[in-house]
Regions:
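A short beta-strand motif that forms the metal-chelation/ATP-contact edge
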Residues: 89-94, 390, 446-450
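Outer-membrane beta-barrel transmembrane domain signature
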Residues: 362-372, 376, 381-419
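Short glycine-rich beta-strand segments
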Residues: 179-183, 231-233, 283-289, 321-325, ...
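Periplasmic polypeptide-binding modules associated with outer-membrane biogenesis and secretion
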Residues: 19-112, 132, 146-165, 298-301, ...
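Coil residues (strongly favoring Ser/Thr
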Residues: 51, 81, 237-238, 328
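C-terminal outer-membrane beta-barrel translocator/porin domains of Gram-negative envelope proteins
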Residues: 256-383
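Gram-negative/organellar outer-membrane beta-barrel architecture
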Residues: 97-260, 265-268, 278, 335-341, ...
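Bacterial Sec-dependent N-terminal signal peptides
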Residues: 1-23, 454
Length: 454
């Protein structure tokens, strides 16, 4: 009887503690040899002095870890809490990434691996190579300096410096960049729903560009970016003979000022491979040039990831785009198959248009998590975590083109694909995808995709 009475009193005490609001007395951070403390503190959904119940603190800790990992500064984040004398003590331990990365560069010039392997006969001539000099977190404020020296099929020199916060409130930032590039071959048309290329003996296109942007991030989830970019492009005269409508005004040169606005809302578990949360992106671009060359573009993306269980989640991802004028020239009418508007199962095809939408939907199931021991013992990288997901997907899309032509039958047609695959997810936002899919043309195949965030 005494034992039951003791358990009853103890349970009441624990319930009282759980419901009691206690102040955050301190936040201790370790492991950040380069990153400034205030950059880490800025991402937390709580500050020193906040009064929180235990039931409020638990989800806040989960969100804090997600926000810190989404800075892409760390390979791991651990957060512990201690209740002592009616106060919370928060302990954050981070493992920093490599920030100085002189890396060899090797990349196919084609849109994806399968197009290079099949349509381009695995030609090693269609490869860009060189060096990427990447200094992330230059001053410990998550600022980045990138210098690319690329040669091979195309040549490119580019440099960019980005700093997210330049003010005391840690809300305003800027970026500046420069690019000079030349191409030996140019995609001049679409025929049979595939890209048509024309190679030039010297340079098919020359480009140089300078840009500057201002960013504003008032809280942990909202981001606004305004960018000014001036560019000058010239294509070879022989290109103009074959494709006179490559640029507006049937000219071989285009010089203009691009003014763009982007709004993002990012509240996902992982910015590279979200398993829960929301992501919204609105992008507007106005090209200021002569009347013949002025264009306007708008695109919007909405992603929703819903956790169904501890091992499964549903991912819904839709993107819509519109380009004006509606009868744009070829260089402004590439749509599905380019950039973020991709349909799994149509890797060999492109769909031109000036307005369109893509919907990508998938069910994912986590089948295995394991850790590999790094054969080369390196600080903060002794272990390599691996996650494997099985997935089933169904995609759909539509692209409107005023002058599609009979050979490009996928324009002005409802598109759909479906299939299954497996994703491998690891450190440095590495994602490798193996997918078997079938499209509405009745064609099916195995497709490989890889992403590495360096």
């Amino acid at each position: 009887m005494r034992l039951l009475f003791f358990i009853f009193i103890l349970s009441l005490s624990l319930t009282s503690v759980a419901q009691q609001k206690m102040p955050v007395a301190g936040i201790d951070i370790t492991g950040n040899s380069k990153t400034k403390d205030y950059i880490i503190l800025r991402e937390l959904p709580f500050v020193k002095g906040d009064s929180l119940e235990a039931k409020q603190l638990a989800p806040a800790i989960i969100q804090a870890k997600q926000l810190l990992m989404n800075t892409q500064l760390f390979v791991d984040v651990q957060i512990d809490t201690l209740a002592n004398d009616g106060q919370w003590q928060i302990r954050i331990q981070v493992k920093e990434r490599w920030y100085l990365l002189p890396l060899p560069y090797f990349r196919l010039v084609d849109r994806n691996f399968n197009q290079w392997w099949v349509d381009q006969n695995r030609s090693l001539d269609r490869v860009n190579y060189g060096m990427k000099f990447i200094q992330n977190n230059v001053s410990g404020r998550n600022d980045n300096l990138n210098v690319w020296l690329i040669t091979g099929y195309n040549r490119q020199f580019s440099a960019r410096y980005t700093i997210p916060f330049i003010d005391k409130k840690l809300t305003k930032g800027f970026s500046v960049g420069f690019l000079h590039a030349t191409q030996k071959e140019l995609n001049i048309a679409t025929a049979g729903n595939k890209q048509v290329f024309l190679r030039h003996s010297s340079d098919a296109r020359k480009t140089w560009r300078i840009d500057a942007s201002y960013s504003y991030r008032p809280d942990r989830f909202k981001r606004t970016t305004i960018r000014l970019s001036y560019f000058n492009e010239t294509i070879a005269d022989t290109i103009l003979i074959v494709q006179k409508n490559y640029y507006p005004g049937q000219t071989n040169r285009q010089a203009a000022l691009d003014i763009s606005y982007r709004y993002q809302y990012i509240n996902v578990s992982n910015i590279t491979y979200p398993t829960s949360g929301y992501y919204s992106d609105l992008f507007l671009l106005k090209r200021v040039a002569s009347r013949a060359q002025s264009i306007f573009q708008i695109s919007a993306r909405q992603l929703y990831a819903k956790k169904l269980s501890t091992k499964s989640f549903l991912l819904l991802d839709a993107t819509a785009a519109y380009k004006s004028p509606i009868d744009s020239v070829f260089s402004n009418s590439r749509l599905i198959g380019y950039g973020g508007m991709q349909l799994r199962g149509l890797e060999y095809y492109v769909v031109d248009g000036t307005a369109g939408i893509v919907s990508r939907n998938a069910f994912h199931f986590n089948v295995k998590n394991f850790t590999l021991t790094n054969p080369v013992p390196i600080k903060n990288h002794e272990k390599i975590p691996i996650r494997l997901y099985l997935k089933m997907f169904a995609d759909a899309g539509y692209a409107y083109h005023k002058y599609a032509g009979r050979s490009n039958s996928l324009s002005n047609t409802l598109l759909y694909t479906y299939g299954a695959g497996i994703d491998l997810v690891s450190v440095y936002d590495f994602v490798f995808r193996v997918e078997y899919s079938r499209n509405q043309l009745g064609r099916e195949g195995l497709y490989l995709q890889g992403e590495f965030n360096f």
